């Protein structure tokens, strides 16, 4: 009769910002299952392609790791060309029956490009060089846009402050923040 009951895993807020040729991507560390916090210090960001690209994930962890592995393969296959690798991953995501069932999103930054690869296989390049995914993404995005527009803060500082704001508002986001920079 109805849908299968599947545990709802909410696990993050990931935010990336590019400013003045420098990129930063960070995430909180909380992983929850339903209304229970499972872990406070989950690492959800990784440096890829010889340290030239940073990616973070939101969604089901096993699904996200599968997508990260596939994305890394695409980066290697296309010589580190971020957009090409993202489009090829999205193409696979849409056409592969196994990948279509994965419940995850990726946020990806290089020094000059920010992309979101959505759970539907879309590649989105935001106009303002800010990427945000996960349960607290809209809070972090709003904070980052304001800080980018009205302060001289660095990309790293904007990511840090914005994730702290999201952690104050979103119950699925904590203040155990990890940030990587390019």
Swiss-Prot record:
**Which Enzyme Commission numbers does its entry carry?**
3.4.25.2
Active-site residues are: 12
One GO term of the biological process aspect: proteolysis involved in protein catabolic process
A GO cellular component annotated for this chain's UniProt record is: proteasome core complex
Top EC group? hydrolase
So where does Na(+) get bound? Answer: 167, 170, 173
Instruction: Give the subcellular location.
Output: Cytoplasm
This protein's major location comes to: cytoplasm
Record-linked InterPro entries: ATP-dep_Prtase_HsIV_su (IPR022281), Ntn_hydrolases_N (IPR029055), Proteasome_sua/b (IPR001353), Proteasome_suB-type (IPR023333)
Q: How is its activity regulated?
A: Allosterically activated by HslU binding.
Which keywords accompany this UniProt record?
Allosteric enzyme, Cytoplasm, Hydrolase, Metal-binding, Protease, Sodium, Threonine protease
Q: Which CDD domains match?
A: protease_HslV
Instruction: Kindly indicate whether the keyword Secreted belongs to this entry.
Output: no
Cite a single Pfam family from the UniProt record: Proteasome
Q: Which GO terms describe its molecular function?
A: metal ion binding; threonine-type endopeptidase activity
Catalytic activity entry = ATP-dependent cleavage of peptide bonds with broad specificity
Q: Does the keyword Metal-binding apply?
A: yes
Q: Which HAMAP family match?
A: HslV
* Stored PANTHER family: ATP-DEPENDENT PROTEASE SUBUNIT HSLV, METALLOPROTEASE TLDD
Stated role: Protease subunit of a proteasome-like degradation complex believed to be a general protein degrading machinery.
Record note on quaternary structure: A double ring-shaped homohexamer of HslV is capped on each side by a ring-shaped HslU homohexamer. The assembly of the HslU/HslV complex is dependent on binding of ATP.
The record's family statement is:
Belongs to the peptidase T1B family. HslV subfamily.
* Name of the protein in its database record: ATP-dependent protease subunit HslV
Which organism is this protein's natural source? Chlorobium limicola (strain DSM 245 / NBRC 103803 / 6330)
